């Protein structure tokens, strides 16, 4: 389904289904056969959403497929790299004394329940009302308890989320730690710039920010990726990122942030694999995404 300016979704449709996909990949990385991360909530959340292919994935019912290149172990390693990057970001930020955390487009992220937060930490989760409600109720049914003070901000990021965040108690005069995981490709250029401008306006000196970005979204229309997607669709993986992401010219996010006083450090997906002791796959599909860039930044102004 091609995006529209005011489209909406839940966790089984459009952009929302990508949150379920990511949670399924986290569940795979947390599965005892790999045990690369600790996330006991990913699998039950995915099962509760009920998308067949992702339920089968977390249940171990989709084996290696040579023709499509699907390999559960490879998927687990890639998601472990991403998850560890954001986990470590929050651990380091809160150990430095930051006590308010904002998870933008939180989806099925369960960090408010699974990380060992210092006493007094407040975690704000920002996402669509339907997404926030589903996760909150499902985790309550599972008997899960937050390990920090969790405050939900049920708002579309295309609306005035900054006002909603402050109404929930966020203090812009206190340093904060922000994540925009798996978000930027789903925003048009002007919305991406506005997102970072809002983050900067709400951030005190010493605040931290983590995100990843795709340097060129044309990769989703690359012939190698299109062929891979067609083969994966036969296994039931039907999400077509080419329809969900926004293409075209974008501001260079690192340069944009630097102008506002953010000092950044970045690593490519290939570099993160090496840092985590994994070999980056040597094939055409992996090559398309080797330059996805993971960035952490500190506001110095």
From Swiss-Prot:
Gene Ontology biological process terms from the UniProt entry: methylation
Binding-site residues for S-adenosyl-L-methionine, renumbered to this chain: 127, 156-157
UniProt xrefs under Gene3D superfamilies: Vaccinia Virus protein VP39 (3.40.50.150)
Keywords from the UniProt entry: Methyltransferase, S-adenosyl-L-methionine, Transferase
Domain of life: Bacteria
Family assignment from sequence similarity: Belongs to the UPF0677 family.
Entry protein name: Putative S-adenosyl-L-methionine-dependent methyltransferase MMAR_4850
PANTHER family: S-ADENOSYL-L-METHIONINE-DEPENDENT METHYLTRANSFERASE YKTD-RELATED, S-ADENOSYL-L-METHIONINE-DEPENDENT METHYLTRANSFERASES SUPERFAMILY PROTEIN
Organism taxonomic ancestry: Bacteria, Bacillati, Actinomycetota, Actinomycetes, Mycobacteriales
GO molecular function term, any single one: methyltransferase activity
Function: Exhibits S-adenosyl-L-methionine-dependent methyltransferase activity.
Organism of derivation: Mycobacterium marinum (strain ATCC BAA-535 / M)
Pfam families given in the database record: LCM (PF04072)
Xref: InterPro entries: Ppm1/Ppm2/Tcmp, SAM-dependent_MTases_sf, SAM_mthyl_Trfase_ML2640-like
EC nos: 2.1.1.-
């Amino acid at each position: 389904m091609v995006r529209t300016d005011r489209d909406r979704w839940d966790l089984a449709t459009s952009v929302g289904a990508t949150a379920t996909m990511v949670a399924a990949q986290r569940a795979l990385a947390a599965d005892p056969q790999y045990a690369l991360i600790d996330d006991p909530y990913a699998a039950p959340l995915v099962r509760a959403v009920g998308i067949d292919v992702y339920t089968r994935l977390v249940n171990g019912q989709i084996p290696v497929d040579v023709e499509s290149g699907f390999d559960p172990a490879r998927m687990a390693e890639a998601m472990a790299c991403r998850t560890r990057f954001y986990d470590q970001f929050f651990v380091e930020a809160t150990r430095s004394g930051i006590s308010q955390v904002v998870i933008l487009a939180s989806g099925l992220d369960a960090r408010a329940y699974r990380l060992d937060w210092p006493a007094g930490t407040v975690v704000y989760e920002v996402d669509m009302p339907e997404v926030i409600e589903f996760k909150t109720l499902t985790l309550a049914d599972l008997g899960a308890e937050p390990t920090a003070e969790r405050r939900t901000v049920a708002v579309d990021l295309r609306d005035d989320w900054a006002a909603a965040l402050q109404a929930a108690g966020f203090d812009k005069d206190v340093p904060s730690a922000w994540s925009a995981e798996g978000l930027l490709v789903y925003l048009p250029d002007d919305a991406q710039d506005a997102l970072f401008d809002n983050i900067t306006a709400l951030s005190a000196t010493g605040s931290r920010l983590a995100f990843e970005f795709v340097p060129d979204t044309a990769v989703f229309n690359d012939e190698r990726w299109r062929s891979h997607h067609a083969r994966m669709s036969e296994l039931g993986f039907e999400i077509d990122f080419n329809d969900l992401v926004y293409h075209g010219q974008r501001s260079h996010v690192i340069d944009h942030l630097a102008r506002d006083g953010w000092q950044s450090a970045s690593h490519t997906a290939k570099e993160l694999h090496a840092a985590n002791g994994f070999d980056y796959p040597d094939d055409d599909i992996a090559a398309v995404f080797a330059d996805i860039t993971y960035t952490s930044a500190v506001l110095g102004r």
